Every structure is written in C-alpha cells, then in structure tokens.
Design a protein with these regions (language model features):
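Divalent metal-binding segments
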Residues: 23-33, 38, 42-301, 313-344, ...
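His/Asp/Glu-enriched, well-ordered alpha-helical/loop segment
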Residues: 217, 344-384, 388-389, 394, ...
Length: 551
C-alpha cells in the first residue's frame, strides 16, 4: 500500500511541469530583456526591456520594473540590437506572393555564378519535375557580367528541373524549359532567350498551371523571405490588369510580370489570412487604369470596398498607385484626360491615395491636380501622397506641404542606376532635401518586379547614394542611418492611417519588432557596405515569433 502511494505521488510530481506548461499554452506574452532596444519614439529612447501582452506593447523601459504574468516567455538578448518592425510603404508583395514555380530571390546576388548557386540550392528542395523560377527584382546590372545567364549555365546549375529566369522584360530558360515552352508555340532562342511577347507568353503559360494550393505555397515562401529581413508590414500597391481579365469594362491591359487578374490576385493572401497563417501585415491599395471618363474599374472599387476594411493583419487601405492611365508625354504637356475626374471621385468617397511618378513633370502635374482636388474636397485628413519622386522643385514641395500631402520615396535607382536622370542632377529620390523641408516623408522599395525587396539594401542606398555597381549616383541626398531607419519605421504608418499603431516600440502599439544580427547604428561594427548584410535573428509580429534565427 505504501509503495502504491509513493508511486502515485511520484507520478503526480512528474506531471506538474506538463500541467503548468499546458496552463500557459494560451499565452502570447513575450518579454525581451538585456537588449539595446531602439524604440524610434519621439524621444528616440534606447531601453533594455520590452514586454508584449495580448499582441500589444505593455512595457518599455529598464529591466525589472514591470510586473509580469507567470506565463510570460522571456528571451535574454545578451546585448543585441532591437528595432521596430520595418514597414515598406510601397511594394508589390501580392505579385511576389503568387509567382509560379518554386521562386528564388536572386536580388542579393552579385554575379551569375552566385545566382546559379542559389538556383541549385533551391532545386534540392523541390519536387521532381517542378519549375524553379526567379522572376523580377533584379536586372543584368546586378551581376558583374552585366548580362542574363545562358541556357548552358542554367542547365549546369539545374539540369533536372525546368527553369524560368526573368526580369522586367527579357527572360531565359534551360533545356527542359525550352522544350515545354516550344510545345506551347512560344519561340525560344537557341541560347534559351525569351524576348518581348515570348517572355510574357511564357509567364502566362506558367501561371495557367497554378492551383490555389500552389499560390498559397508561394505566398508562404514570400512572407518567410521578408520576415528574415525584419519587414513586418507591406503596403501593397496592386497590379496592372492582365490581358483576358474578366469584367474590366475598359480595354486597358498591360501584360508582363507586373500584371495579373485584378480580381483573383489576392486569393492566396486571403487564404492565409482565413487560415490564420498570415504572418506579415499587408495593407492593400487598389490600382485603376481606366481609359474612359466613365472610370468603370475605379468606380467598382470605390462602391464595393470600404476604406480601412479588415483587421490588423490584412486591411484595404487606399487607392493607388494609379487611378487612370499614366503612359503620357508629361514633359510635352500630354496628360491623362480623366485624371482629375478620377481623383475627385477618390476624394469624394474619402479614400487615401498615392500616385506613382517617375519624372519632375509627373510630380508637378500630380501636385497641380492634388491642389485642384483639395479646393473641392480637402485632402489633408486623407493622407494623400506622391510616390517615387526622382526629382522635385522647391515650389512643389511647399505647395504639397501646405495641403498635407506626403512623399513616399523608393530606391529603385539602386538597380536601375542613373539612366534617365537629367544631366548633372542626382538620380534621386531627394531624400535629404525632402526630409529637411519638413514635409512628411517615408520610405519603401517599389519591389515585386523592378526593385530590391530586402529593406537593408534600400537603406544602404539611402545612406550611401551608391547603386548596385558601387557608383555614387545620388550625391548630396544621403541621410543618416537613424533617419533612414525612421523613414522605414516610425514615419511610414502615416501613409495608411496607422501611425498610432505601428512603426515604433511604445506602450499601446502593436507588438512588432526585430532583433538584428549586428549593431546597425554603430559604423565601427557595421560599415556602410555591411548594412547590406543586416538581417533579423528574431522577428515578432503582434507578440508572435514569426521568424526565429536564434535557435
């Protein structure tokens, strides 16, 4: 009898830790201690502890001054650098999330052999016969060879899988891919090259094979990629309408890697959200490129969606980066005829808006139209903005500042170089000029097809003014490391009306933060070139660890 009682007590004692663990299984509370936590708040405080409870920041300050729930998980950072979760105020994450095949991001490669090594590593993990792809966010300038890889190079790297290697325009494939595309009637050169319509047709053929499950897998890869670099919120700026998209009621289409069916392109993001597997916050802006004065697509969006509809993981936030066709000779005085009518409609319905611009003439035309709209419907409370902004004049800065317009600046010139820049001028954007003007400024990438998504490469360009070849192309417009990071965090929530929720580590805000692999703020430890090697070792979204490189 005594033996049985002793055994029962022993069993119960062994079960206590398991019971305690089960009792805490509900908890999302997280405490990070002994870090250099850069809050990016108005005082730019650096503290040692942050605690997140129920998805929101509950305490920021010195270690040991906050009462903890017994179920709070504590992580000792041992002096590591912590920053708020990064926000990209203008990208095309949704396009990235639905790339066909098993995609490889080659945006950080510096040579063709390095890119081929990335493809080879990816091929080791994909099912037999599956496509290995690299679609967008690179140009031949990225590689020291300054060219596309050849069919032979792709075959050597990935002989057992078809490959599609495409930039914004030309593409190349390997022997297995060539055989497939030619069976579809798509012309492929002897060296694997696909040019013009052939490249678009090849991409369309791959997309036609995708199932929803394929797209969901691609979306999971896309979010895992950005979370490794600490990007916790993407402000997505939509897609061009692909030829053949139904129910457009307007004939504007634009084939290529920047295009998709505008109605179904969000399926995989919605699926992840419904399954509670969306780990990066996504804010959606809706493109319209209606050619007619009736503005059918824009009108459908405005009538059938609600501003700010959604939750704090997925939300519809605005209209942009277009409201009407934008392929005009702006310098020659040609403008889209329905542009003002489109923007008047957007303002009337109370939507946030952001406009793409690639020249001074485009910036000036946009600003003049914003002033006309503002005279009818004040837009300051709507947080309208102008995007990209390679050049701008002082008068336009002051005019936009006066009506509450912001500037969303993007480093696509890192890949593109100084081509198209007026002689003797910085390539842009004018980061320092706009920052010093006092107008609201934020930063992002415009990635998804033409620019690098890795935010630390974008920040490198902001700090150094150097492009992917090492050439100084944006002299005089460099900003400090602290300014660059602030533009990528605390200053970006404004563009989608969530400045009080995101962008800094402050009590009450959503618990998004990143533990870095090195001290970004110390140039003695991280050189300017070393900024490109910054990554996350721990990414937290709403108190959940969504990327863990500390294990």
């Amino acid at each position: 009898m005594r033996i049985s009682a002793f055994l029962m007590i022993a069993v119960l004692a062994m079960a206590v830790p398991a019971v305690a663990q089960d009792a805490c299984s509900w908890s999302r509370d997280l405490r990070l201690v002994n870090g250099n936590i850069h809050t990016m708040d108005a005082q730019n405080r650096v503290v040692n502890e942050v605690t997140i409870q129920e998805g929101r920041i509950a305490y920021v300050g010195p270690v040991g001054k906050h009462k903890l729930d017994p179920c709070t998980r504590t992580i000792n950072l041992h002096g590591r650098t912590v920053v708020p979760g990064l926000i990209d105020d203008h990208n095309h994450f949704v396009l990235f999330s639905q790339r066909p095949g098993y995609d490889v991001m080659v945006e950080t490669a510096t040579s063709i052999p390095e890119a081929m090594s990335m493809l080879k590593d990816r091929a080791k993990t994909v099912p037999a016969g599956a496509w290995v792809t690299a679609i967008g966010d690179w140009t031949p300038r990225l590689f020291k060879e300054n060219r596309l890889p050849t069919l032979a190079e792709l075959d050597a790297a990935v002989p057992d899988h078809p490959v599609f290697f495409a930039t914004f325009g030309p593409a190349v494939t390997n022997t297995l891919g060539k055989k497939f595309f030619e069976s579809k009637g798509i012309a492929v050169g002897a060296n694997g090259a696909l040019a013009g319509p052939a490249a678009n047709a090849a991409l369309a053929a791959l997309r036609q094979m995708q199932t929803l499950e394929d797209k969901i897998r691609s979306a999971e890869y896309a979010q895992s990629y950005v979370l490794r670099y600490g990007l916790t919120t993407s402000v997505d700026m939509g897609v061009f309408a692909d030829p053949g998209s139904p129910d457009l009621q307007d004939d504007f289409t634009f084939p290529g890697i920047a295009s998709a069916n505008p109605w179904t392109v969000y399926q995989q993001i919605l699926a992840l959200d419904h399954q509670h597997k969306l780990n990066e916050r996504v804010r959606l802006f809706m493109i319209s490129m209606d050619k007619t004065m009736a503005l059918p697509l824009l009108t459908q969006r405005l009538l059938n969606l609600f501003p700010d509809f959604g939750d704090n993981m997925l939300r519809v936030s605005g209209i942009g980066e277009f409201a009407s066709p934008w392929f005009s000779n702006f310098a020659g005085g040609q403008h889209p005829a329905n542009y003002e009518a489109a923007l008047q409609l957007v303002a009337k319905h109370g939507w946030t808006y952001q406009q793409h611009t690639l020249s001074l003439a485009e910036v000036q035309f946009t600003a003049q139209t914003y002033e006309k709209v503002n005279a009818v419907t004040p837009i300051a409370s709507l947080h309208w903005s102008i995007a990209h902004v390679p050049q701008i004049d002082p008068q336009t800065i002051q005019a936009m500042k006066a009506i509450g317009v912001g500037m969303a600046l993007h480093g696509w010139k890192y890949l593109q170089g100084a081509q198209g820049t007026p002689a003797g001028q910085p390539a842009g954007p004018p980061y320092r000029t706009l920052l010093e003007s006092g107008i609201h400024v934020g930063a992002g990438s415009d990635a998804g097809d033409i620019s690098i998504l890795d935010p630390w490469y974008e920040i490198y360009y902001m700090v150094t003014g150097k492009d992917c070849t090492g050439a100084l192309i944006n002299p005089g417009e460099q900003v400090t490391r602290e300014q660059a990071l602030r533009m990528y965090t605390a200053d970006n929530g404004w563009f989608f009306h969530e400045g009080n929720e995101l962008g800094s580590i402050e009590s009450g805000k959503l618990g998004d933060l990143v533990v870095l692999n090195d001290n970004y703020f110390d140039p003695q430890k991280v050189s300017d070139e070393g900024i490109k090697q910054i990554k996350s070792v721990l990414t937290v979204v709403g108190g959940r660890v969504v990327y863990d490189g500390l294990r």
